[in-house]
Amino acid sequence: MGLLECCARCLVGAPFASLVATGLCFFGVALFCGCGHEALTGTEKLIETYFSKNYQDYEYLINVIHAFQYVIYGTASFFFLYGALLLAEGFYTTGAVRQIFGDYKTTICGKGLSATVTGGQKGRGSRGQHQAHSLERVCHCLGKWLGHPDKFVGITYALTVVWLLVFACSAVPVYIYFNTWTTCQSIAFPSKTSASIGTLCADARMYGVLPWNAFPGKVCGSNLLSICKTAEFQMTFHLFIAAFVGAAATLVSLLTFMIAATYNFAVLKLMGRGTKF
């Protein structure tokens, strides 16, 4: 079998659901982690510049922000590795399912690819044999992991539940900034509200961002409007929105992974193949 024919068969047997989910996962995590990190930094600057002059008032908030930023670093690394592993699992189980139905002959394609990589059996020295042996060991170890789709279904299900909480929490800063922006719109257009401009405020203490004894803790009237007009506020608001969208995209990708893995696992069990290929 030629290399082109082998590649064509591999493309036909590609797990497109896993490919789409992987791309969506990487995009969502990058958006969530990158924008979320910068949005937290912007929030820290806004709080210490406009809402409190005493470092003791927002010291705890800064520690929490820094802790979340370190968590973001770990989240990005974890999802990069786990997404790649889920993609490999998608190729592995989808190939097995299509081999059952006769749509995709993984053994033939695998032989063609192996012959292309190792250069065939003829004329191969000890170095080539050593490399081939190392590759076989790696594939064998990887196959032990990928040969248990039930574990991936369980882990992905638990991860989806956890990420659902992350998605809900990512909506909180969007809600706070949206309320602040709405208050600024009321100040900018007094005809839309019957309240006095001086009584329209954004109170960081009300959301638990600052303790109740923080001073001033809130900004009202024209001072609040001037804050909303700053590029720093606008950028932070939009970064939180982007992080929220990234969390939603990641949640959709995890659901897609879980559905695809569950389907493949169910087919393999029903066809009596078990989880060993």
Curated annotation (Swiss-Prot):
PROSITE patterns, sorted: MYELIN_PLP_1 (PS00575), MYELIN_PLP_2 (PS01004)
Localisation: Cell membrane; Myelin membrane
Gene Ontology terms describing biological process: axon development; central nervous system myelination
Membrane-topology annotation of the record: Multi-pass membrane protein
Family: Belongs to the myelin proteolipid protein family.
Disulphide bridges, residue numbers: 184-228, 201-220
Matching SMART domains: PLP
Residues exposed to the Extracellular side: 37-59, 179-238
Positions where Phosphoserine occurs in the chain: 114
Gene assigned in the entry: PLP1
Organism: Oryctolagus cuniculus (Rabbit)
Quaternary state and interactors: Interacts with MAL.
Pfam families: Myelin_PLP (PF01275)
Residues covalently joined to lipid (S-palmitoyl cysteine): 6-7, 10, 109, 139, 141
Pathological condition linked to this protein in its record: Defects in PLP1 are the cause of paralytic tremor (pt); a sex-linked mutation in rabbit that affects myelination of the CNS.
Positions carrying Phosphothreonine: 116, 118
Descriptive protein name: Myelin proteolipid protein
Transmembrane segments: 11-36, 60-88, 152-178, 239-268
Keyword Acetylation: no
Ranges facing Cytoplasmic side: 1-10, 89-151, 269-277
Cellular component GO terms held in the UniProt record: myelin sheath; plasma membrane
